[in-house]
């Protein structure tokens, strides 16, 4: 699992991010997956029998390990870093990397440090005040082909976290079928 973790992390670092409102989606399928402001996990669930999570990392990181952009969107404090692979019917679909400031973990209805194999989006978007902002989208050419990615800030009970998602080659975003 560490090989895919390293590969995905290095790919995400090379993405050239664009604001969502300036990103040119080629079709409705890309728009559906990249620009949705609701739970990606819920969308993925609709395209498989079993959505599962493989946890790659769930550790604290110091602010000096964050990028300048990440620090600007968060409070410059120690964060819980969660890295996962979201799988649809055992196929790796999305690599997710979430940074949750320790202050955002306090006074929440769920203990996000013990999220385990539950998709974070399911938990976050079950909160009444959950929403997403600062959505950015990008592509990156890899040895596995061109891949899409997105990143945004999620708010749960008025507390921020950052999530970056890399759509892996088997993800439904690359399906030849058009969404209805």
UniProtKB/Swiss-Prot annotation:
Pfam families: Chor_lyase. GO terms for biological process: pyruvate biosynthetic process; ubiquinone biosynthetic process. It catalyses: chorismate = 4-hydroxybenzoate + pyruvate. Keywords: Cytoplasm, Lyase, Pyruvate, Ubiquinone biosynthesis. Substrate binds at residues 82, 120, 165. Its main location: cytoplasm. GO terms for molecular function: chorismate lyase activity. GO terms for cellular component: cytosol. The keyword Nucleus does not apply. Its EC number is 4.1.3.40. It comes from the Bacteria. It is found in: Cytoplasm. It is an enzyme of class 4 (lyase). Pathway: Cofactor biosynthesis; ubiquinone biosynthesis. HAMAP family: UbiC (MF_01632). Belongs to the UbiC family. Removes the pyruvyl group from chorismate, with concomitant aromatization of the ring, to provide 4-hydroxybenzoate (4HB) for the ubiquinone pathway. This is Probable chorismate pyruvate-lyase. It comes from Aliivibrio fischeri (strain ATCC 700601 / ES114) (Vibrio fischeri). The lineage of its organism: Bacteria, Pseudomonadati, Pseudomonadota, Gammaproteobacteria, Vibrionales. The gene is ubiC.
């Amino acid at each position: 699992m560490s090989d895919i973790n390293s590969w995905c992390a290095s790919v995400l670092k090379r993405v050239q991010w664009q604001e969502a409102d300036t990103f040119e989606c080629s079709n409705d399928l890309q728009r559906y997956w990249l620009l949705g402001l609701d739970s990606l996990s819920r969308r993925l669930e609709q395209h498989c029998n079993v959505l599962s999570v493989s946890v790659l990392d769930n550790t604290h990181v110091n602010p000096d390990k964050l990028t300048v952009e990440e620090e600007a969107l968060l409070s410059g404090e120690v964060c819980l870093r969660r890295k996962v692979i979201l799988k649809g019917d055992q196929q790796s679909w999305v690599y997710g990397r979430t940074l949750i400031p320790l202050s955002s973990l306090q006074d929440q209805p769920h203990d996000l440090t013990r999220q385990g194999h539950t998709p974070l989006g399911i938990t976050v978007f079950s909160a009444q005040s959950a929403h997403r902002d600062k959505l950015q989208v990008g592509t990156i050419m890899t040895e596995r082909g061109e891949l899409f990615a997105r990143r945004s800030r999620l708010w749960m009970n008025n507390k921020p976290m950052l999530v970056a998602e890399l759509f892996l080659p088997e993800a439904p975003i690359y399906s030849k079928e058009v969404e209805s």
